[in-house]
């Protein structure tokens, strides 16, 4: 069950660029609630609180209850914009969630047992190819993260989407069996493999020469005179 957070907001009587700039000058962030077959509702949120929510992480997968004039709106953020220079929030889009709604979200991947993976112990490096997985699930069941166990990976081996144990009711959107994690070989690993292969091939050849010489010494001498 996803955790539902409270978020304070006030209704905006006006929309448009001029009204939005006025909200920002007053220390509030203009936003809108839309969806669920209802008209859009312009709102504003206190900038410090909203910035704290965004910086806390997983903002786009967190469900919020917004109370407006005594009516509670259950929403999820679908998009937000930051000031390109000062990096503070300047607008947020919230989508209403109806009862039993399903939603598509991008859930971050969390690695397990990376430090005990055989490939890591042999000097390899964990390469996180896919940082998040796009899934579909009930809005009330959005996982905070999806776990990926890499504890058995060797050097040059990979973990794919089909290797994951997804939570019940969570379905991946990707049709391909995408690569999630790989163990990158350490520097010089390819040369070590070539040297080991060459040494392995040379060993049987070196052992064959003395054996051939010994066999020749035991063979009877040919070409001698026969008794008549």
UniProtKB/Swiss-Prot annotation:
Pfam families: Ribosomal_L25p, Ribosomal_TL5_C. Belongs to the bacterial ribosomal protein bL25 family. CTC subfamily. Keywords: Ribonucleoprotein, Ribosomal protein, RNA-binding, rRNA-binding. Part of the 50S ribosomal subunit; part of the 5S rRNA/L5/L18/L25 subcomplex. Contacts the 5S rRNA. Binds to the 5S rRNA independently of L5 and L18. HAMAP family: Ribosomal_bL25_CTC. GO terms for biological process: translation. Transmembrane segments: none annotated. The keyword Cell cycle does not apply. This is Large ribosomal subunit protein bL25. This is one of the proteins that binds to the 5S RNA in the ribosome where it forms part of the central protuberance. GO terms for molecular function: 5S rRNA binding; structural constituent of ribosome. The lineage of its organism: Bacteria, Pseudomonadati, Pseudomonadota, Alphaproteobacteria, Hyphomicrobiales. Gene3D superfamilies: Ribosomal protein L25, beta domain, Ribosomal Protein L25, Chain P. It comes from the Bacteria.
């Amino acid at each position: 069950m996803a955790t539902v957070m409270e978020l304070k907001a006030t209704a905006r009587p006006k929309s448009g660029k001029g009204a939005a700039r006025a909200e920002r000058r007053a220390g509030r962030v203009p936003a809108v609630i839309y969806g669920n077959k209802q008209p859009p509702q312009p709102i504003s949120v206190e900038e410090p609180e909203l910035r704290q929510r965004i910086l806390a992480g997983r903002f786009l997968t967190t469900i919020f209850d917004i109370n407006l004039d005594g009516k509670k709106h259950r929403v999820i953020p679908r998009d937000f914009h930051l000031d390109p220079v000062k990096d503070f929030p300047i607008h947020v889009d919230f989508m209403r969630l109806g009862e039993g709604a399903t939603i598509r979200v991008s859930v971050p991947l969390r690695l397990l047992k990376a430090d005990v993976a055989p490939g890591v112990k042999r000097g390899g490096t964990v390469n996180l190819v896919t940082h998040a997985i796009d899934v579909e699930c009930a809005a009330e069941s959005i996982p905070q993260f999806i776990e990926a166990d890499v504890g058995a990976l060797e050097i040059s081996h990979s973990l794919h989407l089909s290797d994951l144990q997804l939570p019940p009711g969570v379905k991946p959107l990707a049709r391909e069996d995408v690569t999630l994690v790989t163990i990158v070989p350490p520097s010089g690993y390819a040369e070590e493999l070539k040297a080991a292969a060459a040494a392995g091939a040379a060993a049987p050849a070196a052992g064959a020469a003395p054996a051939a010489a010994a066999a020749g010494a035991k063979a009877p001498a040919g070409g001698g005179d026969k008794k008549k």
